[in-house]
Amino acid sequence: MPKEKYEPPDPRRMYTIMSSEEAANGKKSHWAELEISGKVRSLSASLWSLTHLTALHLSDNSLSRIPSDIAKLHNLVYLDLSSNKIRSLPAELGNMVSLRELHLNNNLLRVLPFELGKLFQLQTLGLKGNPLTQDILNLYQEPDGTRRLLNYLLDNLSGTAKRITTEQPPPRSWIMLQEPDRTRPTALFSVMCYNVLCDKYATRQLYGYCPSWALNWDYRKKAIIQEILSCNADIVSLQEVETEQYYSFFLVELKERGYNGFFSPKSRARTMSEQERKHVDGCAIFFKTEKFTLVQKHTVEFNQLAMANSEGSEAMLNRVMTKDNIGVAVLLELRKESIEMPSGKPHLGTEKQLILVANAHMHWDPEYSDVKLVQTMMFLSEVKNIIDKASRNLKSSVLGEFGTIPLVLCADLNSLPDSGVVEYLSTGGVETNHKDFKELRYNESLTNFSCHGKNGTTNGRITHGFKLQSAYESGLMPYTNYTFDFKGIIDYIFYSKPQLNTLGILGPLDHHWLVENNISGCPHPLIPSDHFSLFAQLELLLPFLPQVNGIHLPGRR
Protein backbone atom coordinates (compact mmCIF):
# COMPACT_ATOMS: atom_id res chain seq x y z
CA MET A 1 0.00 0.00 0.00
CA PRO A 2 -0.71 2.42 -1.51
CA LYS A 3 -1.46 0.53 -4.70
CA GLU A 4 -2.27 3.48 -7.00
CA LYS A 5 0.59 5.47 -8.44
CA TYR A 6 0.75 8.91 -6.86
CA GLU A 7 1.36 11.97 -9.03
CA PRO A 8 2.38 15.02 -6.95
CA PRO A 9 0.95 18.43 -7.84
CA ASP A 10 2.75 20.43 -10.51
CA PRO A 11 4.93 22.92 -8.58
CA ARG A 12 4.29 25.53 -11.27
CA ARG A 13 0.57 25.39 -10.46
CA MET A 14 -0.49 26.61 -13.90
CA TYR A 15 -4.00 27.95 -14.25
CA THR A 16 -6.26 28.98 -17.12
CA ILE A 17 -8.74 31.85 -16.97
CA MET A 18 -12.05 30.94 -18.57
CA SER A 19 -13.10 33.24 -21.40
CA SER A 20 -16.49 34.97 -21.38
CA GLU A 21 -17.42 32.90 -24.42
CA GLU A 22 -16.66 29.64 -22.60
CA ALA A 23 -18.68 30.80 -19.62
CA ALA A 24 -21.58 31.77 -21.88
CA ASN A 25 -21.48 28.29 -23.45
CA GLY A 26 -21.91 26.72 -20.03
CA LYS A 27 -18.37 25.44 -19.49
CA LYS A 28 -17.87 24.46 -15.87
CA SER A 29 -14.81 25.59 -13.96
CA HIS A 30 -12.70 22.96 -12.24
CA TRP A 31 -10.03 23.64 -9.69
CA ALA A 32 -8.73 21.00 -7.32
CA GLU A 33 -5.88 23.02 -5.77
CA LEU A 34 -5.86 26.15 -3.65
CA GLU A 35 -2.99 28.37 -2.50
CA ILE A 36 -3.34 30.94 0.26
CA SER A 37 -0.41 33.27 0.96
CA GLY A 38 0.39 36.71 2.37
CA LYS A 39 1.33 36.12 6.02
CA VAL A 40 -2.21 34.99 6.84
CA ARG A 41 -2.84 34.60 10.61
CA SER A 42 -6.19 32.79 10.56
CA LEU A 43 -8.27 30.82 8.08
CA SER A 44 -11.92 31.29 7.15
CA ALA A 45 -14.26 28.53 8.28
CA SER A 46 -15.69 28.44 4.74
CA LEU A 47 -12.40 26.88 3.59
CA TRP A 48 -13.43 23.57 5.18
CA SER A 49 -16.47 23.31 2.89
CA LEU A 50 -14.23 22.96 -0.19
CA THR A 51 -14.22 19.18 0.10
CA HIS A 52 -13.35 18.73 -3.58
CA LEU A 53 -9.79 19.99 -2.99
CA THR A 54 -6.96 17.52 -3.53
CA ALA A 55 -4.09 19.94 -2.76
CA LEU A 56 -3.88 22.83 -0.29
CA HIS A 57 -0.86 25.15 -0.20
CA LEU A 58 -0.65 27.17 3.04
CA SER A 59 3.12 27.66 3.36
CA ASP A 60 4.85 30.95 4.24
CA ASN A 61 2.07 32.34 6.40
CA SER A 62 1.78 33.22 10.10
CA LEU A 63 -0.59 30.46 11.19
CA SER A 64 -0.14 29.41 14.83
CA ARG A 65 -2.81 26.71 14.87
CA ILE A 66 -4.73 24.50 12.47
CA PRO A 67 -8.38 23.83 13.40
CA SER A 68 -9.67 20.26 13.63
CA ASP A 69 -12.15 21.04 10.83
CA ILE A 70 -9.32 20.59 8.34
CA ALA A 71 -10.20 16.87 8.47
CA LYS A 72 -13.35 17.70 6.50
CA LEU A 73 -11.11 18.03 3.42
CA HIS A 74 -11.11 14.26 3.06
CA ASN A 75 -9.97 14.28 -0.58
CA LEU A 76 -6.67 16.05 0.13
CA VAL A 77 -3.62 14.15 -1.04
CA TYR A 78 -1.22 17.09 -0.65
CA LEU A 79 -1.03 19.51 2.29
CA ASP A 80 1.74 22.07 2.73
CA LEU A 81 1.87 23.87 6.09
CA SER A 82 5.59 24.69 5.96
CA SER A 83 7.08 27.93 7.29
CA ASN A 84 4.32 28.94 9.68
CA LYS A 85 4.26 29.31 13.48
CA ILE A 86 2.33 26.13 14.24
CA ARG A 87 2.94 24.80 17.77
CA SER A 88 0.60 21.79 17.73
CA LEU A 89 -1.41 19.71 15.29
CA PRO A 90 -5.02 18.54 15.73
CA ALA A 91 -5.48 14.81 16.32
CA GLU A 92 -8.12 14.86 13.55
CA LEU A 93 -5.32 15.28 11.02
CA GLY A 94 -4.87 11.52 11.37
CA ASN A 95 -8.27 10.94 9.78
CA MET A 96 -7.10 12.42 6.46
CA VAL A 97 -6.01 9.01 5.25
CA SER A 98 -5.89 10.04 1.58
CA LEU A 99 -2.81 12.20 2.22
CA ARG A 100 0.33 11.26 0.30
CA GLU A 101 2.37 14.38 1.17
CA LEU A 102 2.35 16.40 4.39
CA HIS A 103 4.84 19.25 4.67
CA LEU A 104 5.37 20.66 8.17
CA ASN A 105 8.91 22.03 7.82
CA ASN A 106 10.00 25.15 9.71
CA ASN A 107 7.31 25.37 12.35
CA LEU A 108 7.40 25.30 16.18
CA LEU A 109 6.33 21.67 16.67
CA ARG A 110 7.75 19.93 19.75
CA VAL A 111 5.54 16.83 19.64
CA LEU A 112 3.39 15.04 17.07
CA PRO A 113 -0.05 13.57 17.77
CA PHE A 114 0.00 9.76 17.76
CA GLU A 115 -3.00 9.93 15.40
CA LEU A 116 -0.58 10.99 12.65
CA GLY A 117 0.39 7.31 12.47
CA LYS A 118 -2.98 6.59 10.84
CA LEU A 119 -1.77 8.29 7.63
CA PHE A 120 -0.64 4.96 6.22
CA GLN A 121 -0.60 6.18 2.61
CA LEU A 122 1.76 9.06 3.38
CA GLN A 123 4.89 8.96 1.23
CA THR A 124 6.46 12.30 2.16
CA LEU A 125 6.51 13.83 5.63
CA GLY A 126 8.44 17.09 6.01
CA LEU A 127 9.53 17.82 9.59
CA LYS A 128 12.83 19.69 9.24
CA GLY A 129 13.29 22.91 11.18
CA ASN A 130 11.05 21.94 14.12
CA PRO A 131 12.20 21.68 17.78
CA LEU A 132 11.00 18.06 17.99
CA THR A 133 12.02 15.71 20.80
CA GLN A 134 15.13 13.67 20.21
CA ASP A 135 13.34 10.30 20.07
CA ILE A 136 11.12 11.52 17.22
CA LEU A 137 14.09 13.03 15.38
CA ASN A 138 16.12 9.83 15.75
CA LEU A 139 13.35 7.77 14.16
CA TYR A 140 12.75 10.33 11.43
CA GLN A 141 16.43 10.48 10.46
CA GLU A 142 16.79 6.69 10.07
CA PRO A 143 16.63 5.08 6.60
CA ASP A 144 12.95 4.90 5.62
CA GLY A 145 12.41 7.30 8.50
CA THR A 146 8.93 8.46 7.47
CA ARG A 147 7.60 4.90 7.51
CA ARG A 148 9.36 4.05 10.78
CA LEU A 149 8.03 7.15 12.49
CA LEU A 150 4.47 6.57 11.29
CA ASN A 151 4.60 2.95 12.46
CA TYR A 152 5.86 4.08 15.86
CA LEU A 153 3.06 6.63 16.20
CA LEU A 154 0.38 4.15 15.12
CA ASP A 155 1.64 1.40 17.41
CA ASN A 156 1.52 3.79 20.37
CA LEU A 157 -1.75 5.49 19.44
CA SER A 158 -3.85 3.37 21.79
CA GLY A 159 -1.16 2.89 24.40
CA THR A 160 -1.46 -0.83 25.05
CA ALA A 161 -3.71 -3.58 23.79
CA LYS A 162 -5.33 -3.67 27.26
CA ARG A 163 -6.72 -0.19 26.92
CA ILE A 164 -8.50 -0.82 23.63
CA THR A 165 -10.49 -3.88 24.74
CA THR A 166 -12.92 -1.71 26.73
CA GLU A 167 -14.43 -0.18 23.58
CA GLN A 168 -15.96 -3.21 21.91
CA PRO A 169 -18.15 -2.79 18.81
CA PRO A 170 -21.91 -3.16 19.31
CA PRO A 171 -23.27 -6.72 18.98
CA ARG A 172 -24.45 -7.74 15.53
CA SER A 173 -28.22 -8.12 15.42
CA TRP A 174 -29.99 -11.42 14.75
CA ILE A 175 -32.31 -11.32 11.72
CA MET A 176 -35.22 -13.78 11.82
CA LEU A 177 -36.31 -14.86 8.34
CA GLN A 178 -38.95 -17.54 9.00
CA GLU A 179 -40.36 -19.90 11.60
CA PRO A 180 -39.50 -23.62 11.62
CA ASP A 181 -41.86 -26.11 9.99
CA ARG A 182 -43.74 -27.89 12.80
CA THR A 183 -45.77 -30.15 10.50
CA ARG A 184 -43.01 -32.66 9.69
CA PRO A 185 -39.78 -34.13 11.10
CA THR A 186 -37.00 -31.53 11.06
CA ALA A 187 -33.55 -30.86 12.44
CA LEU A 188 -32.24 -27.38 13.23
CA PHE A 189 -28.54 -26.62 13.08
CA SER A 190 -26.35 -23.54 12.71
CA VAL A 191 -23.44 -22.85 10.35
CA MET A 192 -20.57 -20.38 10.55
CA CYS A 193 -18.31 -19.34 7.66
CA TYR A 194 -15.24 -17.27 8.55
CA ASN A 195 -11.97 -16.30 6.87
CA VAL A 196 -9.69 -15.77 9.88
CA LEU A 197 -6.79 -14.05 7.99
CA CYS A 198 -3.70 -16.23 8.13
CA ASP A 199 -0.76 -14.73 10.04
CA LYS A 200 1.60 -14.62 7.06
CA TYR A 201 -0.86 -12.47 5.09
CA ALA A 202 -1.40 -10.01 7.97
CA THR A 203 1.43 -7.62 7.05
CA ARG A 204 1.86 -3.86 7.36
CA GLN A 205 2.38 -3.74 3.58
CA LEU A 206 -1.21 -4.95 3.09
CA TYR A 207 -2.80 -3.45 6.20
CA GLY A 208 -0.80 -0.29 6.89
CA TYR A 209 -3.73 1.24 8.77
CA CYS A 210 -3.57 -1.39 11.54
CA PRO A 211 -1.02 -1.22 14.40
CA SER A 212 1.55 -3.99 14.23
CA TRP A 213 0.58 -5.32 17.68
CA ALA A 214 -3.04 -5.67 16.50
CA LEU A 215 -1.86 -7.62 13.42
CA ASN A 216 0.09 -10.03 15.61
CA TRP A 217 -1.47 -13.50 15.58
CA ASP A 218 -1.20 -13.99 19.34
CA TYR A 219 -3.36 -10.89 19.76
CA ARG A 220 -5.84 -11.62 16.97
CA LYS A 221 -6.40 -15.30 17.71
CA LYS A 222 -8.00 -14.51 21.08
CA ALA A 223 -10.71 -12.40 19.46
CA ILE A 224 -11.14 -14.92 16.62
CA ILE A 225 -11.75 -17.88 18.91
CA GLN A 226 -13.98 -15.71 21.10
CA GLU A 227 -16.14 -14.88 18.07
CA ILE A 228 -16.32 -18.54 17.03
CA LEU A 229 -17.27 -19.70 20.52
CA SER A 230 -19.79 -16.91 21.08
CA CYS A 231 -21.72 -17.99 17.99
CA ASN A 232 -21.67 -21.59 19.23
CA ALA A 233 -22.39 -22.89 15.72
CA ASP A 234 -23.00 -26.59 15.14
CA ILE A 235 -20.81 -26.43 12.01
CA VAL A 236 -17.83 -24.06 11.63
CA SER A 237 -16.12 -23.58 8.25
CA LEU A 238 -12.86 -21.63 8.33
CA GLN A 239 -10.57 -20.38 5.57
CA GLU A 240 -6.93 -19.21 5.79
CA VAL A 241 -6.18 -21.50 8.72
CA GLU A 242 -2.44 -22.01 9.14
CA THR A 243 -1.51 -25.70 9.41
CA GLU A 244 0.31 -25.37 12.73
CA GLN A 245 -2.48 -23.22 14.19
CA TYR A 246 -5.10 -25.79 13.20
CA TYR A 247 -3.43 -28.52 15.26
CA SER A 248 -2.02 -26.44 18.13
CA PHE A 249 -4.82 -23.90 18.56
CA PHE A 250 -8.14 -24.33 16.74
CA LEU A 251 -8.47 -28.10 17.16
CA VAL A 252 -7.38 -27.94 20.81
CA GLU A 253 -9.75 -25.08 21.69
CA LEU A 254 -12.73 -26.48 19.81
CA LYS A 255 -12.32 -30.10 20.93
CA GLU A 256 -12.68 -28.84 24.50
CA ARG A 257 -16.06 -27.43 23.45
CA GLY A 258 -17.32 -30.66 21.91
CA TYR A 259 -16.18 -30.26 18.29
CA ASN A 260 -14.29 -32.55 15.96
CA GLY A 261 -12.63 -31.26 12.82
CA PHE A 262 -11.06 -31.90 9.44
CA PHE A 263 -8.38 -29.79 7.75
CA SER A 264 -6.37 -29.77 4.54
CA PRO A 265 -3.61 -27.32 3.59
CA LYS A 266 -3.17 -25.81 0.13
CA SER A 267 -1.52 -28.05 -2.42
CA ARG A 268 1.89 -26.39 -2.14
CA ALA A 269 2.35 -28.09 1.25
CA ARG A 270 3.11 -31.44 -0.39
CA THR A 271 6.34 -30.08 -1.94
CA MET A 272 7.63 -28.39 1.22
CA SER A 273 9.77 -29.38 4.16
CA GLU A 274 8.05 -30.18 7.43
CA GLN A 275 9.04 -26.81 8.88
CA GLU A 276 7.76 -24.82 5.88
CA ARG A 277 4.57 -26.87 5.76
CA LYS A 278 3.56 -25.59 9.21
CA HIS A 279 2.89 -22.14 7.79
CA VAL A 280 0.79 -23.15 4.77
CA ASP A 281 -2.85 -22.17 5.15
CA GLY A 282 -5.87 -24.22 4.21
CA CYS A 283 -9.54 -24.91 4.93
CA ALA A 284 -11.07 -26.48 8.03
CA ILE A 285 -14.50 -27.78 8.99
CA PHE A 286 -15.51 -28.33 12.61
CA PHE A 287 -18.76 -29.95 13.78
CA LYS A 288 -20.33 -30.67 17.14
CA THR A 289 -20.07 -34.34 17.97
CA GLU A 290 -23.27 -34.25 20.03
CA LYS A 291 -25.14 -33.43 16.82
CA PHE A 292 -23.16 -35.18 14.06
CA THR A 293 -20.89 -38.15 13.49
CA LEU A 294 -18.25 -38.19 10.76
CA VAL A 295 -18.88 -40.62 7.91
CA GLN A 296 -16.39 -39.48 5.24
CA LYS A 297 -13.88 -36.68 4.66
CA HIS A 298 -12.56 -35.43 1.33
CA THR A 299 -9.95 -33.01 0.00
CA VAL A 300 -10.37 -31.47 -3.46
CA GLU A 301 -7.15 -30.15 -5.03
CA PHE A 302 -8.00 -27.86 -7.92
CA ASN A 303 -4.58 -28.02 -9.57
CA GLN A 304 -4.78 -31.81 -9.76
CA LEU A 305 -8.25 -31.63 -11.31
CA ALA A 306 -7.06 -29.00 -13.79
CA MET A 307 -4.20 -31.22 -14.90
CA ALA A 308 -6.43 -34.29 -15.24
CA ASN A 309 -9.10 -32.42 -17.23
CA SER A 310 -7.08 -29.98 -19.32
CA GLU A 311 -8.12 -31.59 -22.65
CA GLY A 312 -5.35 -29.62 -24.34
CA SER A 313 -6.52 -26.27 -22.98
CA GLU A 314 -3.53 -23.98 -22.45
CA ALA A 315 -5.60 -21.75 -20.17
CA MET A 316 -6.40 -24.73 -17.95
CA LEU A 317 -2.72 -25.65 -17.71
CA ASN A 318 -1.20 -22.17 -17.48
CA ARG A 319 -3.82 -20.36 -15.42
CA VAL A 320 -5.82 -22.87 -13.36
CA MET A 321 -3.26 -25.60 -12.72
CA THR A 322 -0.72 -23.10 -11.35
CA LYS A 323 -3.01 -22.06 -8.46
CA ASP A 324 -2.92 -24.25 -5.37
CA ASN A 325 -6.33 -23.51 -3.84
CA ILE A 326 -8.27 -26.39 -2.31
CA GLY A 327 -11.65 -27.35 -0.96
CA VAL A 328 -12.68 -29.81 1.73
CA ALA A 329 -15.88 -31.72 2.39
CA VAL A 330 -17.22 -33.88 5.20
CA LEU A 331 -20.13 -36.27 5.01
CA LEU A 332 -21.92 -36.15 8.35
CA GLU A 333 -24.63 -38.29 9.89
CA LEU A 334 -27.21 -36.44 11.94
CA ARG A 335 -27.68 -37.94 15.39
CA LYS A 336 -31.24 -39.07 16.07
CA GLU A 337 -31.43 -36.95 19.22
CA SER A 338 -31.28 -33.85 17.02
CA ILE A 339 -34.47 -34.73 15.14
CA GLU A 340 -37.61 -32.81 16.11
CA MET A 341 -40.95 -34.50 15.45
CA PRO A 342 -44.21 -32.63 14.76
CA SER A 343 -46.02 -31.73 17.98
CA GLY A 344 -48.17 -34.58 19.22
CA LYS A 345 -46.44 -37.17 17.03
CA PRO A 346 -44.46 -39.95 18.76
CA HIS A 347 -40.74 -40.20 18.09
CA LEU A 348 -40.64 -43.62 16.46
CA GLY A 349 -37.06 -43.46 15.18
CA THR A 350 -35.89 -43.02 11.62
CA GLU A 351 -33.29 -44.12 9.15
CA LYS A 352 -29.95 -42.36 9.31
CA GLN A 353 -29.86 -38.87 7.81
CA LEU A 354 -26.72 -37.69 6.01
CA ILE A 355 -25.62 -34.17 5.10
CA LEU A 356 -22.57 -33.00 3.14
CA VAL A 357 -20.74 -29.88 4.30
CA ALA A 358 -18.24 -28.37 1.86
CA ASN A 359 -15.78 -25.52 2.37
CA ALA A 360 -13.49 -23.82 -0.17
CA HIS A 361 -11.26 -20.80 -0.71
CA MET A 362 -10.95 -19.67 -4.32
CA HIS A 363 -8.09 -17.73 -5.94
CA TRP A 364 -7.89 -14.09 -4.83
CA ASP A 365 -6.69 -12.09 -7.86
CA PRO A 366 -9.44 -9.96 -9.54
CA GLU A 367 -7.64 -10.42 -12.88
CA TYR A 368 -8.31 -14.18 -12.74
CA SER A 369 -12.10 -14.29 -12.83
CA ASP A 370 -11.82 -17.27 -15.20
CA VAL A 371 -9.79 -19.24 -12.66
CA LYS A 372 -12.30 -18.60 -9.86
CA LEU A 373 -15.15 -19.75 -12.08
CA VAL A 374 -13.36 -22.92 -13.21
CA GLN A 375 -12.31 -23.71 -9.62
CA THR A 376 -15.93 -23.36 -8.48
CA MET A 377 -17.11 -25.66 -11.29
CA MET A 378 -14.50 -28.26 -10.41
CA PHE A 379 -15.41 -28.12 -6.74
CA LEU A 380 -19.14 -28.52 -7.31
CA SER A 381 -18.50 -31.34 -9.76
CA GLU A 382 -16.47 -33.20 -7.12
CA VAL A 383 -19.09 -32.45 -4.45
CA LYS A 384 -21.76 -33.92 -6.74
CA ASN A 385 -19.64 -37.05 -7.26
CA ILE A 386 -19.29 -37.47 -3.48
CA ILE A 387 -23.04 -37.07 -2.95
CA ASP A 388 -23.98 -39.36 -5.85
CA LYS A 389 -21.65 -42.10 -4.61
CA ALA A 390 -22.90 -41.83 -1.03
CA SER A 391 -26.54 -41.76 -2.20
CA ARG A 392 -26.11 -44.99 -4.15
CA ASN A 393 -25.23 -46.74 -0.91
CA LEU A 394 -28.41 -45.57 0.81
CA LYS A 395 -31.91 -46.96 0.59
CA SER A 396 -34.56 -44.82 -1.05
CA SER A 397 -36.39 -44.58 2.28
CA VAL A 398 -33.40 -42.67 3.69
CA LEU A 399 -33.39 -40.13 0.86
CA GLY A 400 -37.16 -39.81 1.00
CA GLU A 401 -39.07 -37.59 -1.41
CA PHE A 402 -35.98 -35.44 -2.05
CA GLY A 403 -33.94 -38.26 -3.55
CA THR A 404 -30.51 -36.93 -2.57
CA ILE A 405 -28.25 -35.91 0.30
CA PRO A 406 -28.54 -32.22 1.25
CA LEU A 407 -25.56 -29.90 0.78
CA VAL A 408 -24.23 -26.93 2.75
CA LEU A 409 -21.53 -25.01 0.88
CA CYS A 410 -19.41 -22.42 2.70
CA ALA A 411 -16.74 -20.49 0.82
CA ASP A 412 -14.59 -17.45 0.41
CA LEU A 413 -15.25 -17.25 -3.32
CA ASN A 414 -13.30 -14.00 -3.78
CA SER A 415 -16.15 -13.11 -6.14
CA LEU A 416 -18.82 -10.42 -5.96
CA PRO A 417 -22.58 -11.14 -6.21
CA ASP A 418 -22.65 -10.05 -9.88
CA SER A 419 -19.82 -12.43 -10.86
CA GLY A 420 -20.00 -15.52 -13.02
CA VAL A 421 -19.14 -17.62 -9.96
CA VAL A 422 -22.23 -16.52 -8.02
CA GLU A 423 -24.40 -16.68 -11.15
CA TYR A 424 -23.24 -20.27 -11.69
CA LEU A 425 -24.00 -21.29 -8.11
CA SER A 426 -27.32 -19.50 -7.69
CA THR A 427 -28.90 -20.12 -11.12
CA GLY A 428 -27.64 -23.66 -11.70
CA GLY A 429 -25.23 -22.88 -14.51
CA VAL A 430 -23.39 -20.38 -16.66
CA GLU A 431 -22.85 -19.82 -20.39
CA THR A 432 -19.60 -21.15 -21.84
CA ASN A 433 -18.99 -17.73 -23.38
CA HIS A 434 -19.52 -15.82 -20.12
CA LYS A 435 -17.36 -12.69 -19.92
CA ASP A 436 -15.57 -14.00 -16.82
CA PHE A 437 -13.91 -16.66 -18.98
CA LYS A 438 -12.10 -13.75 -20.73
CA GLU A 439 -12.59 -15.41 -24.14
CA LEU A 440 -10.06 -18.09 -23.17
CA ARG A 441 -10.49 -21.59 -24.56
CA TYR A 442 -11.95 -23.74 -21.78
CA ASN A 443 -14.94 -25.28 -23.59
CA GLU A 444 -13.67 -28.83 -24.08
CA SER A 445 -12.40 -29.21 -20.53
CA LEU A 446 -15.44 -27.57 -18.91
CA THR A 447 -17.83 -30.21 -20.25
CA ASN A 448 -16.14 -32.63 -17.84
CA PHE A 449 -17.60 -30.63 -14.96
CA SER A 450 -21.13 -30.20 -16.27
CA CYS A 451 -23.84 -32.28 -14.62
CA HIS A 452 -24.62 -33.70 -18.09
CA GLY A 453 -21.16 -35.26 -18.18
CA LYS A 454 -18.51 -35.24 -20.87
CA ASN A 455 -20.76 -36.79 -23.50
CA GLY A 456 -23.87 -34.84 -22.55
CA THR A 457 -25.38 -31.90 -24.39
CA THR A 458 -24.30 -28.59 -22.87
CA ASN A 459 -26.28 -26.28 -25.19
CA GLY A 460 -23.56 -23.72 -24.55
CA ARG A 461 -24.08 -23.87 -20.80
CA ILE A 462 -22.23 -25.58 -17.95
CA THR A 463 -24.61 -26.71 -15.20
CA HIS A 464 -24.19 -28.31 -11.77
CA GLY A 465 -27.54 -29.97 -11.03
CA PHE A 466 -28.06 -28.55 -7.52
CA LYS A 467 -30.74 -26.07 -6.48
CA LEU A 468 -28.67 -23.74 -4.34
CA GLN A 469 -29.75 -20.71 -2.39
CA SER A 470 -27.67 -18.20 -0.44
CA ALA A 471 -28.41 -17.90 3.27
CA TYR A 472 -27.67 -14.18 2.98
CA GLU A 473 -30.03 -12.84 0.35
CA SER A 474 -29.30 -9.54 -1.41
CA GLY A 475 -29.12 -6.55 0.89
CA LEU A 476 -28.80 -8.42 4.19
CA MET A 477 -25.02 -7.96 4.37
CA PRO A 478 -23.40 -4.98 2.58
CA TYR A 479 -19.90 -6.45 2.75
CA THR A 480 -18.10 -9.48 4.15
CA ASN A 481 -14.59 -8.21 3.35
CA TYR A 482 -13.76 -4.74 4.71
CA THR A 483 -10.35 -3.25 3.89
CA PHE A 484 -9.29 0.30 3.08
CA ASP A 485 -9.32 -0.18 -0.69
CA PHE A 486 -11.99 -2.89 -1.03
CA LYS A 487 -15.33 -3.40 0.63
CA GLY A 488 -17.64 -6.06 -0.79
CA ILE A 489 -19.38 -9.41 -0.48
CA ILE A 490 -17.05 -12.31 -1.30
CA ASP A 491 -17.97 -14.88 1.41
CA TYR A 492 -21.06 -17.06 1.14
CA ILE A 493 -23.14 -19.82 2.70
CA PHE A 494 -25.16 -21.73 0.08
CA TYR A 495 -27.50 -24.64 0.79
CA SER A 496 -29.53 -27.04 -1.33
CA LYS A 497 -33.26 -26.66 -1.77
CA PRO A 498 -35.83 -27.95 -0.99
CA GLN A 499 -34.36 -29.94 1.92
CA LEU A 500 -32.90 -26.87 3.67
CA ASN A 501 -34.28 -23.47 4.67
CA THR A 502 -32.76 -20.45 6.41
CA LEU A 503 -34.50 -19.53 9.65
CA GLY A 504 -32.23 -16.63 10.62
CA ILE A 505 -28.86 -15.00 10.09
CA LEU A 506 -26.41 -12.82 11.99
CA GLY A 507 -26.67 -9.32 10.57
CA PRO A 508 -23.84 -6.92 9.66
CA LEU A 509 -21.70 -4.91 12.03
CA ASP A 510 -23.24 -1.47 12.62
CA HIS A 511 -21.97 0.74 9.79
CA HIS A 512 -22.47 3.89 11.88
CA TRP A 513 -20.07 2.51 14.48
CA LEU A 514 -17.41 1.99 11.80
CA VAL A 515 -17.89 5.54 10.49
CA GLU A 516 -18.02 7.20 13.91
CA ASN A 517 -14.79 5.48 14.94
CA ASN A 518 -13.06 6.32 11.64
CA ILE A 519 -12.42 2.64 10.91
CA SER A 520 -11.48 2.76 7.24
CA GLY A 521 -10.45 -0.89 7.06
CA CYS A 522 -9.94 -4.14 8.95
CA PRO A 523 -8.23 -5.79 10.69
CA HIS A 524 -8.40 -3.27 13.52
CA PRO A 525 -7.55 -3.56 17.23
CA LEU A 526 -11.23 -4.41 17.80
CA ILE A 527 -11.82 -6.52 14.66
CA PRO A 528 -9.35 -9.42 14.24
CA SER A 529 -9.78 -10.25 10.53
CA ASP A 530 -10.36 -8.38 7.29
CA HIS A 531 -13.46 -10.56 6.88
CA PHE A 532 -16.68 -10.58 8.88
CA SER A 533 -18.05 -13.99 9.82
CA LEU A 534 -21.29 -15.34 8.39
CA PHE A 535 -23.62 -17.23 10.72
CA ALA A 536 -26.95 -18.81 9.81
CA GLN A 537 -29.48 -21.13 11.42
CA LEU A 538 -30.74 -23.71 8.95
CA GLU A 539 -33.67 -26.10 9.05
CA LEU A 540 -33.31 -29.56 7.54
CA LEU A 541 -36.59 -31.08 6.37
CA LEU A 542 -36.46 -34.82 6.94
CA PRO A 543 -38.28 -37.48 4.91
CA PHE A 544 -41.59 -38.70 6.30
CA LEU A 545 -41.39 -42.15 7.82
CA PRO A 546 -42.85 -45.08 5.86
CA GLN A 547 -46.54 -45.64 6.61
CA VAL A 548 -48.49 -48.84 7.22
CA ASN A 549 -52.29 -48.40 7.45
CA GLY A 550 -51.74 -44.69 8.00
CA ILE A 551 -49.33 -45.25 10.90
CA HIS A 552 -45.70 -44.08 10.71
CA LEU A 553 -43.26 -46.91 11.23
CA PRO A 554 -39.47 -46.76 11.34
CA GLY A 555 -37.80 -47.83 8.11
CA ARG A 556 -36.09 -51.22 8.07
CA ARG A 557 -32.34 -51.49 7.80
Curated annotation (Swiss-Prot):
CDD domains noted in UniProt: Deadenylase_CCR4a
Gene Ontology cellular component terms for the protein in this record: CCR4-NOT complex; cytosol; membrane; nucleus
Gene3D superfamilies associated with the record: Endonuclease/exonuclease/phosphatase, Ribonuclease Inhibitor
Region of interest called Nuclease domain, as start-end residue ranges on this chain: 153-557
Positions with a binding annotation for substrate: E240, E276, H361, P366, N414, N481, F486
Keyword list, A-Z: Activator, Cytoplasm, Exonuclease, Hydrolase, Leucine-rich repeat, Magnesium, Metal-binding, Nuclease, Nucleus, Repeat, RNA-binding, RNA-mediated gene silencing, Transcription, Transcription regulation, Translation regulation
GO biological process: miRNA-mediated gene silencing by mRNA destabilization; nuclear-transcribed mRNA catabolic process, no-go decay; nuclear-transcribed mRNA poly(A) tail shortening; positive regulation of cell population proliferation; positive regulation of cytoplasmic mRNA processing body assembly; regulation of translation
One Pfam family linked to the record: Exo_endo_phos
LRR repeat locations: 52-73, 75-96, 98-120, 121-143
Subunit-level organization: Component of the CCR4-NOT complex; distinct complexes seem to exist that differ in the participation of probably mutually exclusive catalytic subunits; the complex contains two deadenylase subunits, CNOT6 or CNOT6L, and CNOT7 or CNOT8. Interacts with CNOT7 and CNOT8. Interacts with UNR. Interacts with ZFP36L1 (via N-terminus). Interacts with ZNF335.
Descriptive protein name: CCR4-NOT transcription complex subunit 6
Organism: Homo sapiens
Gene that encodes the chain: CNOT6
